[in-house]
C-alpha cells in the first residue's frame, strides 16, 4: 500500500471510529440523562446535588393525562420510599410532591413557594389576575385583603343566610317534583345541586338568580360557560410542559379559551355596567352583592373593570363546582350507609323540635354529627387532591435536607395523606365518629386534613363554602330519605379540575313528613 493510500485509509478509519464513538457516547449520555433520578426535567438542573438527593422515577411521566394521577403518584412515592418528598418530571416541567403532613406544611407555609404555576388555560381565562393564580406581590396582597375584609368576612357570610336557605328549599321543591314525575322516583343529584350552587354564587356575587326550569335561559347559558371553562382548565395540555409546542396550539386550548373569554367579558361586563347604573341611583350606598362591594372600594383597593371581571369570573368557578361535588359525595355515602343517615336525621330532627321548622345556620353548631360527616367525606374524597395544591418555587430553597431549585412546581398529595394508615385508623372505612372523638380542624392548620389549602394560598371562601354545604346537606336529609335506586352507587372517581364521581349519583329521594311547607 502506498503511503498516500495508507494515510487515506487511516484517516477514514479514524473518522468512522470517531463517529461510532460519538454515536455510542450520545446514546449513553441520553440514556443516563433520561434515567436521572426525577427524570428528564431534573437532569437539566445545574446542580448535580439537587438532581440526586430527592428520590423519584426516571424518564418523563404523563401521569396527569390519566384519570387518577393522585393514586399513581401515591403508589410511586411508596415504591421509591419517597413519601416526604419525591421528584418527577412531566416533559420539561420539574416537580416535587409530598405525601406527608410535616413536609407538606413546610412547603405550603414557606414564602419560597408563594407563587402558583399558571397553566396556559388559566392565563388565557384571565385567572392570572384573580386571587388563585395572581403572582405573589402587591396586587395579590390587595386581593387577599379585599377577600378577607369585604367579601368573606363573618358578617358578609351571615348576611347571605337567607340566600342559602332559599336556594336550598328551591332544590327541595325541584327534587319533590322530579321524584313525583319519575316512575322510579329517582333523581340525578348533581344536575340539581350544580344548578343550585351556580344560583347561589350568582345571587351572592351578582345579585341575580335563575329559574331551575327555564330552558335556554341565562342560567343555562352561564352553566355552559362554566362547564366549558372547567373542561379547559382540567385538560392536560402538552404545551404546558413542552415549551416548543406553545407555538402550535395542537389541542386547540388557546383558541377555545379566547372564544370563551370573549363571551365572559360580554356577560360579566354587562352585569358590572348594570351595577354601575344602579349605584348611581342608589343614594344609600347599600351593598347587596359582591359586585356592589367591589365597586364601592376606595382609592388603593379599587380594581379596574378588567381585573374585576377576572376576580368575579374566578368566584363563579371556585364557588360552584366544589360545593356541588362535595354535596354529591356526601349523599352517595348516605345512600351506602343508611345507619349513618338515620343517625344524622335524628340529630337534625332533635335540633328543629322534631322537624316543626326548617333548618337554619344557627342550628349547625348544634349538629356535630353533620359536621363530622362532611369532614369524613372530605377525608375520603378530597375535592382537590393534587392540582389545586400546586405551588411554584420562586428561588432555590431547602425542603428538609433536599435542595429544590427555583422554578420547581411543588405539590401535596392530600389524597395520599388522608388514606395513610399511619395517620388514620382504618383509613378506607367511612367513620364520621373519628371526628367526634377528635376535633380535627379542616381550615388549614392541621395538614392531616386540609381540603381548602394552607398558608398564604389557602382558599379565601372556605368558611362560606362550608356554611353552604352544611346547610344544604341538613336540608336535603331533613326533607328526604336517600336510598339506592335502580343502579348501584359506585364510588369510582375521576380527577378533572376537582375529584368527581366517575358515574354521577342517581338514587331515590323519598320525601319525609315534616311540619313545615
Curated annotation (Swiss-Prot):
| Cellular component annotations (GO), alphabetically ordered | endoplasmic reticulum; membrane
Tell me its cofactors.
heme
User: Residues that bind heme, according to the entry?
Assistant: 459
Q: Briefly, what is this protein's role?
A: Plays a role in regulating directional growth at the meristem/organ boundary. Is required for the promotion of leaf and floral organ growth and for the prolongation of the plastochron. Promotes organ growth in a non-cell-autonomous manner and may generate a mobile growth signal distinct from the classical phytohormones that prevents premature arrest of proliferation, until the correct primordium size has been reached. Functions probably in association with CYP78A7 in regulating relative growth of the shoot apical meristem and plant organs.
Transmembrane ranges? 20-40
Q: Which keywords, in A-to-Z order, does the entry hold?
A: Developmental protein, Growth regulation, Heme, Iron, Membrane, Metal-binding, Monooxygenase, Oxidoreductase, Transmembrane, Transmembrane helix
* Family indicated by similarity: Belongs to the cytochrome P450 family.
Q: Which organism is it from?
A: Arabidopsis thaliana (Mouse-ear cress)
Q: What is its main location?
A: membrane
Membrane topology designation: Single-pass membrane protein
Share any extra remarks.
Plants over-expressing CYP78A5 have twisted and kinked stems, defects in floral organogenesis and reduced fertility.
> What Pfam families does UniProt report for this protein, alphabetically?
p450
InterPro entries tied to this protein: Cyt_P450, Cyt_P450_CS, Cyt_P450_E_grp-I, Cyt_P450_sf, Cytochrome_P450_78A
Please name the Gene3D superfamilies in this protein's record.
Cytochrome P450 (1.10.630.10)
**Highest taxon listed in the record's lineage:** Eukaryota
Q: What tissues has this protein been observed in?
A: Expressed in the periphery of the shoot apical meristem and inflorescence meristem, on the adaxial sides of developing floral organs and in developing ovules in the region where the integuments emerge.
Q: Which GO terms describe its molecular function?
A: heme binding; iron ion binding; monooxygenase activity; oxidoreductase activity, acting on paired donors, with incorporation or reduction of molecular oxygen
Q: What is its EC number?
A: 1.14.-.-
Spell out the protein name for this chain: Cytochrome P450 78A5
User: Which GO biological-process labels does this protein carry?
Assistant: floral organ development; organ growth; positive regulation of cell population proliferation; positive regulation of organ growth; regulation of growth rate
Phenotype upon loss of function: Reduced size of leaves, sepals, petals and seeds. Increased leaf number.
Amino acid at each position: 500500500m502506498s503511503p498516500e493510500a495508507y494515510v487515506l485509509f487511516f484517516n477514514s478509519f479514524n473518522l468512522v471510529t470517531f463517529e461510532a464513538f460519538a454515536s455510542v457516547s450520545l446514546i449513553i449520555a441520553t440514556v443516563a440523562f433520561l434515567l436521572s433520578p426525577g427524570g428528564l426535567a431534573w437532569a437539566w438542573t445545574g446542580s448535580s446535588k439537587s438532581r440526586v438527593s430527592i428520590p423519584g422515577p426516571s424518564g418523563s411521566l404523563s401521569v396527569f393525562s390519566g384519570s387518577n394521577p393522585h393514586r399513581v403518584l401515591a403508589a410511586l412515592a411508596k415504591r421509591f420510599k419517597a413519601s416526604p418528598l419525591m421528584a418527577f418530571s412531566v416533559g420539561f416541567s420539574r416537580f416535587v410532591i409530598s405525601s406527608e403532613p410535616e413536609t407538606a406544611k413546610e412547603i405550603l407555609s414557606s414564602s419560597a413557594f408563594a407563587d402558583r404555576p399558571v397553566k396556559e388555560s388559566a392565563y388565557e381565562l384571565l385567572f392570572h389576575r384573580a386571587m388563585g393564580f395572581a403572582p405573589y406581590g402587591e396586587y395579590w396582597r390587595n386581593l387577599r385583603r379585599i377577600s378577607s375584609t369585604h367579601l368573606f368576612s363573618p358578617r358578609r357570610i351571615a348576611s347571605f343566610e337567607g340566600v342559602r336557605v332559599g336556594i336550598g328549599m328551591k332544590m327541595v321543591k325541584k327534587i319533590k317534583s322530579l321524584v313525583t314525575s319519575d316512575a322510579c322516583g329517582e333523581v340525578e343529584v348533581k344536575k340539581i345541586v350544580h344548578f343550585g350552587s351556580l344560583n347561589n354564587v350568582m345571587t351572592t356575587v351578582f345579585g341575580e338568580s335563575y329559574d331551575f326550569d327555564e330552558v335556554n335561559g341565562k342560567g343555562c347559558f352561564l352553566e355552559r360557560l362554566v362547564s366549558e371553562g372547567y373542561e379547559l382548565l382540567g385538560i392536560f395540555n402538552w404545551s404546558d410542559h413542552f415549551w416548543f409546542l406553545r407555538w402550535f396550539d395542537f389541542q386547540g386550548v388557546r383558541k377555545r379559551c379566547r372564544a370563551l373569554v370573549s363571551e365572559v367579558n360580554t356577560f360579566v361586563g354587562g352585569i358590572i355596567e348594570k351595577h354601575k347604573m344602579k349605584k348611581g341611583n342608589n343614594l344609600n350606598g347599600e351593598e347587596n352583592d359582591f359586585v356592589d362591594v367591589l365597586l364601592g372600594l376606595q382609592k388603593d383597593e379599587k380594581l379596574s373593570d378588567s381585573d374585576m371581571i377576572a376576580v368575579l369570573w374566578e368566584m363563579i368557578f371556585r364557588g360552584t363546582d366544589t360545593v356541588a361535588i362535595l354535596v354529591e359525595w356526601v349523599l352517595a355515602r348516605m345512600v351506602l350507609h343508611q345507619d349513618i343517615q338515620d343517625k344524622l336525621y335524628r340529630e337534625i330532627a332533635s335540633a328543629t323540635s322534631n322537624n316543626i321548622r326548617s333548618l337554619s345556620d344557627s342550628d349547625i353548631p348544634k349538629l356535630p354529627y353533620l359536621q363530622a360527616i362532611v369532614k369524613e367525606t372530605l377525608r375520603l374524597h378530597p375535592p382537590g387532591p393534587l392540582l389545586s395544591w400546586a405551588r411554584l418555587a420562586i428561588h432555590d430553597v431547602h425542603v428538609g435536607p433536599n435542595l429544590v431549585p427555583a422554578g420547581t412546581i411543588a405539590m401535596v398529595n392530600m389524597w395520599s395523606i388522608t388514606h395513610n394508615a399511619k395517620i388514620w385508623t382504618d383509613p378506607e372505612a367511612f367513620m364520621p365518629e373519628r371526628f367526634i372523638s377528635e376535633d380535627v380542624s379542616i381550615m388549614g392548620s392541621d395538614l392531616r386534613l386540609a381540603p381548602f389549602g394552607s398558608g398564604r394560598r389557602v382558599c379565601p371562601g372556605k368558611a362560606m363554602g362550608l356554611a353552604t354545604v352544611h346547610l344544604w346537606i341538613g336540608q336535603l336529609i331533613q326533607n328526604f330519605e336517600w336510598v339506592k335506586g335502580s343502579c348501584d352507587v359506585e364510588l369510582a372517581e375521576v380527577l378533572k379540575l376537582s375529584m368527581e364521581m366517575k358515574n354521577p349519583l342517581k338514587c331515590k329521594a323519598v320525601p319525609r313528613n315534616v311540619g313545615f311547607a
